[in-house]
Regions:
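Acyl-CoA/ACP chain-elongation machinery
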Residues: 174-196, 201-210, 214-215, 248-255, ...
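Conserved beta-ketoacyl condensing-enzyme motif
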Residues: 6-7, 28-141, 145-146, 154, ...
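Fold-independent oxyanion-binding glycine-rich loops
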Residues: 10, 101-103, 133, 146, ...
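Active-site pocket-shaping loop/turn-to-helix segments
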Residues: 59-80, 130-131, 151-162, 208-225, ...
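Active-site-proximal alpha-helical scaffold in enzymes
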Residues: 75-85, 141-180, 221-237, 274-299
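Short, well-ordered secondary-structure micro-motifs
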Residues: 109-111, 188-190, 323-324
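Condensing-enzyme catalytic core mediating Claisen C-C bond formation in acyl metabolism
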Residues: 2-13, 18-47, 192-263, 299, ...
Length: 329
């Protein structure tokens, strides 16, 4: 069983821009990437995050006859940024896996497929177009392009980090790209608008944090990738790590961390970036806790954190929570 697991790479494609460096720079400047705008005809402007245009061909030499969907392109670009940041070469990629997490999946591709099937083609359509509607098509595109041969799978609204942590801990992989991706659709915005959950003024962004009972939210598309790696692989490759992932849990429960977030690290540090990004992107204080050198509890259990460790706890829909402890020395 592997003893130590490290975070060695970050990849980001968000409304703040493409690339880890550009994104974190804007985060430190206090930007969120959210704007009051309408992305679809007939839908009123609301607070939303729009991805900046990035030339897929500029970064990716795609040789297959069928071009990836915009959903897959977003995923490929996010993983590319993480792979470059972790300095993973072609030889190491052969034993690297990828765990993809999504909530909405390729909803836009499904909508386009059904419109063409029902209204344009009248029931006659190429089976190749159906493959673009399957969630794990994006995972296949990434695996083929980067020639990944390690364990890979797709998760729906679960933690890719938790699964990757277990795979490395059990010795089933040395490097795993953990990723989360979603592309917001007009159907989601229409539904949330009908339920009164959207915001229509940029100055109301604080309501996302303050009024957690009402459930105000701002939606955006994006992809985030984190590279987890065993200590043996890290030493063999001679690369540096951001931090050590000490512990990782996921569970169904209803309790939240008892104390509000306290952060003492500079924002240039990994834990500071995580906290700053999470609050800007709309995670409420009750949903996230990052703590240094203090006790915390979940349910009936109490734990003591070492002075150099950071606890990250996030709670998502359905009372599914994730707990990560990061050594930030």
């Amino acid at each position: 069983m592997k003893q130590n697991i490290y975070i060695t790479g970050l990849g980001l494609y968000t409304p703040l821009g493409y690339g880890k460096d550009d994104t974190l720079k804007k985060l430190r400047q206090g930007e969120s990437g959210l704007k009051v705008k309408s992305l679809w005809e007939g839908i009123p402007p609301c607070l939303i995050g729009e991805l900046p245009e990035v030339s897929f061909n500029q970064y990716i030499d795609w040789k297959e006859p069928f071009r990836p969907t915009p959903y897959s392109q977003l995923f490929i670009l996010g993983c590319l940024d993480a792979i470059k940041d972790a300095q993973i070469d072609e030889k190491d990629l052969e034993s690297t896996g990828c765990i993809m997490e999504t909530c909405l999946g390729p909803s836009e591709s499904v909508n386009d497929y059904m419109k063409e099937l029902l209204f344009k083609r009248k029931g006659i359509i190429s089976p190749m177009k159906f493959t673009r509607t399957v969630s794990n098509t994006a995972l296949g595109d990434v695996s083929r392009y980067f020639k990944l041969k390690g364990p890979s799978c797709i998760l729906l609204t679960e933690s890719s980090v938790s699964y990757a942590y277990d795979l490395i801990k059990l010795g089933m992989a040395d490097i795993i790209i953990c990723s989360a991706i979603d592309v917001v659709t007009q159907e989601v915005i229409l539904l949330k608008g009908h339920d009164g959950k959207l915001l229509y003024n940029a100055h109301d962004i604080d309501k996302i944090h303050e009024d957690t009972n009402h459930g105000f939210d701002a939606w955006a598309s994006g992809c985030c990738a984190v590279v987890l790696e065993s200590e043996e692989s890290l030493q063999r490759r001679g690369t540096k790590a951001y931090a050590r992932l000490v512990s990782c849990q996921e569970r169904l429960e209803g309790d939240s961390v008892c104390a509000p977030p306290q952060i003492t690290n500079d924002y240039k540090q990994f834990s500071g970036n995580m906290f700053y990004a999470s609050t800007l992107f709309g995670l409420a204080v009750a949903s996230l806790s990052i703590k240094n050198g203090e006790s915390y509890h979940i349910g009936e259990k109490s734990h003591k954190v070492k002075s150099q460790e950071v606890v990250v706890y996030s709670k998502r829909d359905g009372d599914m929570s994730s707990l990560f402890i990061i050594d930030n020395k």
